[in-house]
A protein has these predicted regions:
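Structural motif
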Residues: 41-42, 69-70, 110
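N-terminal, charge-rich interaction modules
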Residues: 1-46
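Short, composition-biased local secondary-structure segments
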Residues: 39-59
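Extracellular/luminal Protease-associated
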Residues: 58-74
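Conserved strand-to-helix beginnings and helix N-cap segments that scaffold or border functional pockets
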Residues: 51, 77-80
Length: 132
């Protein structure tokens, strides 16, 4: 075994297998862009009235997971957890974030869906650091 292969083998043994598209996974709360059905910024999750588009996506989609940024206060994402429970959708609160992400909520499918428009582009979104 060459030194390069040996080093890679040892690195994976110590730190786990290599991760594909790590920057994308950091942004989308552990998921990949190609799997995202809908994403909200932290500011959008903090909005007092939950988005109907989130409810519709949870109702009308199969094999999805609701990913929630654990940096947010429970009160801000509680309505979305209730929506997920009403519609039988699994959810995860992602709190082991090593990197900052402007996203507060992501609805991700188990397989690639390649949606072009994944953001709700309202005033709150336009004030965020994300650009479509």
């Amino acid at each position: 075994m060459s030194d390069e292969k040996m080093d890679l083998y040892l690195q994976q043994g110590m730190y786990g297998p290599l991760e594909t598209k790590p920057d994308e996974r950091h942004l989308f709360l552990g998921s990949l862009r190609e799997r995202v059905l809908l994403a909200l910024t932290k500011g959008q999750v903090l909005r007092s009235k939950p988005y109907e588009k989130v409810e519709n996506a949870l109702k009308n989609s199969k094999n999805i997971t609701l990913l929630i940024n654990g940096e947010l206060q429970y009160q801000s994402y509680s309505p979305y957890i209730q929506m997920a429970n009403r519609n039988g959708v699994h959810f995860k609160i992602v709190s082991d974030l090593q990197f900052h992400t402007p996203l507060g909520l992501v609805i991700a499918a188990d397989i690639a869906v390649n949606r072009e428009l994944i953001y709700i582009q309202d005033d709150i979104f336009n004030r965020s650091v994300l650009k479509p």
